Design a protein with these regions (language model features):
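Nudix hydrolase/Nudix homology domain
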Residues: 4-25, 29, 103-104, 115, ...
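Short, well-ordered strand-loop elements centered on a beta-strand within folded domains, enriched
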Residues: 30-31, 56-62, 86-95
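Conserved Nudix-box catalytic region and its N-terminal flanking loop in Nudix hydrolases
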Residues: 10, 68-82, 86-125, 142-145, ...
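Short amphipathic beta-strand and strand-loop transition segments with alternating hydrophobic
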Residues: 29-37
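Residues in well-ordered beta-strands of folded domains
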Residues: 49, 63, 79, 109, ...
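Acidic, metal-coordinating catalytic segment for phosphate/diphosphate chemistry
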Residues: 37-79
Length: 233
């Protein structure tokens, strides 16, 4: 529950044994006002006043980035596939310590979109900085939300192919900024979820939900649904 938000449920009428439904919508939900509670260099906390589907006025605590550019997503996530002769295709991943989590996380390379950048340009720049690899964009998703119950942060997922036989990619060099400590991991595409699960058993690490969902999708692509490891747990 957040800032007075009520969770809608379907309950049972004990007298009749029939299911009762939530109230029917009577209006279109909309924002009334947004007030800044606190603001830092990168983030701000706001109190959002809104009207719910049945006309009640409520409040919500919302976090927002201070760096958002007009008409653009906040950042990009990069699914980069490294292709090399006589090697399995590998997904390029990054491992780094995240202070909010208090431990290391396994993520796709990612970063904020700078002013004037497209998602494609931002993705290639961030990939080069974080991993040292030079790639080619092969696909871009629409703008998607990250954690809509907490913030208005958005991202675009950019698919990139990396020619591992290219001389520039045989010995990639990261271009990290001050305070950035990023370890690059190459996980075979056909063993992606297994590699993630093994890593979680060996280390104190949290996997980004987007990464794990991608792993489940790859498992479904390579194996029958009833053989998914996650379904056997």
């Amino acid at each position: 529950m957040n800032g007075g938000k009520k969770i809608g449920t379907i309950s049972t009428d004990n007298s009749t044994g029939k299911m009762s439904s939530p109230p029917k919508p009577t209006t279109i939900p909309h924002i009334v006002k947004e007030e800044v509670i606190a603001s830092g260099k990168w983030l701000k906390l706001e109190k959002t006043t809104y009207v719910d589907p049945v006309g009640n006025t409520r409040t919500w605590e919302t976090t927002k980035r201070t760096t958002r550019q007009a008409n653009a997503a906040d950042g990009v996530g990069i699914i980069a596939l490294l292709k090399r002769t006589l090697h399995k295709d590998c997904v390029v991943m990054v491992k780094q310590f995240r202070p909010p989590m208090g431990c290391c996380t396994l993520e796709f390379p990612a970063g904020l979109i700078d002013e004037g950048e497209s998602a494609e340009i931002a993705a290639l720049r961030e990939l080069k900085e974080e991993t040292g690899y030079k790639g080619e964009v092969v696909g871009v998703t629409p703008v998607t939300c990250l954690d809509p119950g907490l913030s208005n942060c958005t991202t675009q997922i950019v698919m990139v192919n990396i020619n591992g036989d290219d001389l520039e990619n045989t010995n990639p060099t990261q271009q990290l900024g001050d305070g950035e400590f990023v370890e690059v991991l190459l996980l075979p595409l056909d063993e992606f979820q297994r590699e993630i699960d093994d890593l979680m058993k060996k280390e104190k690490i949290v996997v980004d939900s987007k990464v794990y969902i991608y792993g489940m999708g790859m498992s479904q692509a390579f194996f029958k649904p009833n053989e998914l490891r996650v379904l056997k747990q």
